[in-house]
Amino acid sequence: MKLNRFGAVLSVLSAGALVLSGCGSDNNGAGAGAAGSSSSKVSCGGKKALKASGSTAQANAMTRFVNAFEQACPGQTLNYTANGSGAGISEFNGKQTDFGGSDSPLAPSEYAAAQQRCGSPAWNLPVVFGPIAITYNVAGLNSLNLDGATAAKIFNGAITTWNDPGIQALNPGVALPAEPIHVVFRNDESGTTDNFQKYLDAAADGAWGKGAGKTFKGGVGEGAKGNDGTSAAIKATEGSITYNEWSFAQAQKLNMAKIITSAGPDAVAISADSVGKTIAGAKISGQGNDLVLDTLSFYKPTQAGSYPIVLATYEIVCSKYPDPQVGTAVKAFLQSTVGAGQNGLADNGYIPIPDAFKSRLSAAINAIT
């Protein structure tokens, strides 16, 4: 097994990412119930060494998934390069990899390129779910509340100091320093950035005004590459703030803001429970086995205690591969991922895929040829 980040061997972080999957049923509703035992059938065979790349948010989960694949199918493996969602889609469409990992589903233009690459429709299969943390480094500030509008104003430069009245109003009684805010953003094409900006666009009630996309549009701050790059920048910079996939924030022991949502006045911290409540409201907007999620319900939840900044990581696959040996192996890898790959995830801070969604996801996986 090889797990690569930016072409180098991935050093797996000791703290696990939160993997929440509970967003599908026969009626396009979502469920967040507990998963049952992982005994899914794996039909091994095909290409011996698969190659994939993309999302850094799923890099930690991939460790367990690749191990499960190697155990289920001796002599087969997957080499995964965690180089960002944009690269994952580009390399998949360029036939450099066998599938891509992306924190955003394919855009219309990417669908066309993927169909040309595959010679068949491409499918977005959501396998990993995780929250995005707003992390910060301010000496003496161990707790911080933000809402969508205030976060948007920080990340587009409308708020520039930590003791701004807008921040102070959300943190009564907290001594906020009169020091400048240093915004750090992802400077690579990133599904994490896309999802974070979608949250700002939806939850800020017009305060963001920059739109979304895989490149950061805030117009302020300093760039860093990948979740690990932004995490390192925050640790090194007093007065800084950024957005990270949760496992990186945990691994680097970064301070994480609590988020006030449209569902109630209480600020909500990231937890399995708070993210599970959010995912329970997800709907599938894709057709057939293309399991694209409608995530707008994440960003403005109606249930109190829901953490709103959540992304889904998709595996971008061909429905019918030009080389059937590749299709067989990709199917086997994903079968082991939703099967034995789920075992023990909770021990490392992961949440297994609930049965309600696993059955729908498995049906799509089994249809890959």
Swiss-Prot record:
Topology with respect to the bilayer: Lipid-anchor
GO biological process, one term: phosphate ion transmembrane transport
GO terms, molecular function: phosphate ion binding
Signal sequence annotation: 1-22
Chain segments annotated as transmembrane: none
Residues carrying lipid (S-diacylglycerol cysteine): C23
One GO CC annotation: ATP-binding cassette (ABC) transporter complex
Lipidation (N-palmitoyl cysteine): C23
Signal listed as a keyword: yes
Annotated InterPro entries: ABC_phos-bd_PstS, PBP_domain, Phosphate-bind_PstS
Keyword annotations: Cell membrane, Lipoprotein, Membrane, Palmitate, Phosphate transport, Signal, Transport
KW Ribonucleoprotein (keyword) present: no
Binding site for phosphate: S55, T56, A57, S85, D103, S190, G191, T192
Quaternary structure, from the entry: The complex is composed of two ATP-binding proteins (PstB), two transmembrane proteins (PstC and PstA) and a solute-binding protein (PstS).
NCBIfam families: 3a0107s03
PANTHER family: PHOSPHATE-BINDING PROTEIN PSTS (PTHR42996:SF1)
Stated role: Part of the ABC transporter complex PstSACB involved in phosphate import.
Designated name of the protein: Phosphate-binding protein PstS 3
Annotated source species: Mycobacterium avium
Lineage of source species: Bacteria, Bacillati, Actinomycetota, Actinomycetes, Mycobacteriales
